[in-house]
Amino acid sequence: MTDARPRICILGGGFGGLYTALRLGQLSWEGHTPPEIVLVDQRDRFLFAPFLYELVTEEMQTWEIAPPFVELLAESGVIFRQAEVTAIDFDHQKVLLNDQDKGTESLAFDQLVIALGGQTPLPNLPGLKDYGLGFRTLEDAYKLKQKLKSLEQADAEKIRIAIVGGGYSGVELAAKLGDRLGERGRIRIIERGKEILAMSPEFNRQQAQASLSAKGIWVDTETTVTAITATDVTLQFREQEDVIPVDLVLWTVGTTVSPLIRNLALPHNDQGQLRTNAQLQVEGKTNIFALGDGAEGRDASGQLIPTTAQGAFQQTDYCAWNIWANLTGRPLLPCRYQPLGEMLALGTDGAVLSGLGIKLSGPAALLARRLVYLYRFPTWQHQLTVGLNWLTRPLGDWLKNEPS
């Protein structure tokens, strides 16, 4: 930039981007020119993704899990730009944006953070794009709620749902839908591997399997989907093929890197993720950092940092510090990742968690999960507002239902 004030440009308002921006706003720039910190995201709201399931069951409301960026950043000194990132010009250190109001423009940077996240892979499967529904964004949750409402209002005896993918998202979503639909639901998880939650601790996997069984949710392992229509899915188990009638297909199969990240003129791994060093700098670029789903991050010990919310949480402190160090002439710190365990929601009245020597399931785990995530909300103001709402909502519901 020609301006004496350096600019830090953060692309992506997910966990990695937003929390890095907030942390940068908290650091002291005494004795140095304070930078301009700009956060860019194409949506107007941050999404606390672990609670997206609670939106479907109406345990939580949109404002709780998806507060507007302008509210979260109001007292941080961080500037928010709602725009789509279309390209990055590394030679001239500019980000090209498509702004709904301003059209195409560029944004110069001195320090850059690439935290654009990932997307659900959509293979060339017959019927998937027309009849499959993803579950990653706020818009996906709204579409699912609308579809469920339509199915619930119809006079069909059963509501048949196929969930493709037996990872965290598929299992948590199945359990929540099982509780919402009750006896009327006919839910099936389709997993091509030998078991669901293949990366989970054994305790979590066993508790999840027991919960799904108790809710009457079927699990088909070593099974692939070969076609989807408006009324059925075709499944292949070894050499056998079956056609199963369905009302709704939910696609929750993994994460892939966005085409924008994949096409950047930067070092990538075989999955298209940006290669970074332990300081979270993109290889060969001292002023460009990457974290989250779009980056292959390794900590000081060489341990691969998982592309989860927990991994992003821990990366953001180091990312913010190292940008600050770049601009103030301090030494950069290598990231140190500490696995803290795993939590899964298993319906509206239970969960499971394990980590740091603790194993917990049922309502106690559900409460612990909520409190841990409440603590992880972006700002203390949002923590306070949501926490008070959780405390007072039961009283409000009771008063609403109390006979006059």
Curated annotation (Swiss-Prot):
Catalytic activity annotation: demethylphylloquinone + NADPH + H(+) = demethylphylloquinol + NADP(+)
The record's free-text note on cofactor binding: Binds 1 FAD per subunit.
Source organism superkingdom: Bacteria
Keyword Disulfide bond: no
GO function term, MF aspect, one: NAD(P)H dehydrogenase (quinone) activity
Activity control: Inhibited by dicumarol.
Cofactor(s) of this protein: FAD
Gene Ontology process terms (BP): aerobic electron transport chain; phylloquinone biosynthetic process
Residues the entry annotates as binding FAD: 7-43
SUPFAM superfamilies in alphabetical order: FAD/NAD(P)-binding domain (SSF51905)
Protein name, entry field: Demethylphylloquinone reductase NdbB
The species this protein was found in: Synechocystis sp. (strain ATCC 27184 / PCC 6803 / Kazusa)
Organism classification: Bacteria, Bacillati, Cyanobacteriota, Cyanophyceae, Synechococcales
